[in-house]
């Protein structure tokens, strides 16, 4: 969860715009079923990340979404291996697989039974199967909160990695505008940039209270 109201709305806006782009791509014209699945998974991810930025997002179940996005990561990974050609395209699908995996990670981090990174005393204060919405310690875990080094390392990798990805996609969008290029198979470069920026902010919120 993000505590700063302005930043919370920024993150929400990024993911809502991305979800709108994916939704329009599904209904705008007929596409192969595999592309509909791709856009649908990105739509679901954008909605889930927008919800996660808000306090009431902690009240939603976490096990189901974690498993769902883990399977989504498997889908993109399998597609990259068996269904697409070209190194660049495979790399793109692999990137989206990692993004789905990162979403699954965030949901797992919210559930101490899926990802036990906190102390036993913290677990004892939580109700069965969920995390209290007002506290949401797992989503705002600063370095001094007792989380292991590997947990913080993963979140740092997510923060830096998606920040770099956001810059990459933003630059690519500018280049495409100059060349009048378009994207049709997956969210366009501006959508990719917004998703990556939102993910970087949420990963940062898992490292420091913002």
Swiss-Prot record:
Lineage, top-rank taxon, reads Bacteria
Please name the InterPro entries in this protein's record.
DUF5134 (IPR033458)
According to the record, the segments passing through the membrane are 9-29, 35-55, 64-84, 91-111, 149-169, 190-210
* Membrane topology category: Multi-pass membrane protein
Which positions carry the signal peptide feature in this UniProt record? Answer: none
Cellular component terms per the entry's GO annotation = plasma membrane
Spell out the subcellular localization from the entry.
Answer: Cell membrane
Q: What keyword terms does UniProt attach to this protein?
A: Cell membrane, Membrane, Transmembrane, Transmembrane helix
Induction conditions? Highly up-regulated during the early stages of invasion of the human blood-brain barrier.
Q: What is this protein called?
A: Uncharacterized protein Rv0970
